[in-house]
Amino acid sequence: MRKYLPLVVALLLALCTTALAQEAKPSPEPSPKPKPAMSKAQIQKALIATEKKLWEGWKNKDPKPFRTWVANDSVGITDHGTETKADLLKEIAAGGCEVKSYELSDFKLTMINSGAAILSYKGVADGTCGGQPVPPTWSSTTYVNRGGKWWAVAHQESPAK
């Protein structure tokens, strides 16, 4: 056993030297933590705020909220048929509606999946479009989360009775 002791010590020294001589690997940079998923209540609050910005834009004849929140591939469904985002922007710019005030109520959010939702609600406006009173509507807007931003991709209105 004694005759193997110097050999064992030499092997241990060689192993230790090899282990110490290895290049230290830098620790990986911590990757940014992804934003935590929003709760349904947080999504509803955000989408209601967006919907109100769109109604404010309509009331004030301001196309900016529509450029900001309505997707380029969106579709609108009204009593006149379907319209694109470009049609909607032309309609806002033409200013055919005079809206004094509006009220949105009875919100309901339906989650399709974590990146798509339908916000439905009742809209009542004090105003006219084309000289006719604006009727109360039941409306729904479908939103899709693209790159972390909720975009309106479809909107429809039906007269409320």
Regions inferred by a protein language model and the residue ranges of each:
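A beta-strand edge to alpha-helix "cap/lid" segment located at domain peripheries
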Residues: 22-68, 73-161
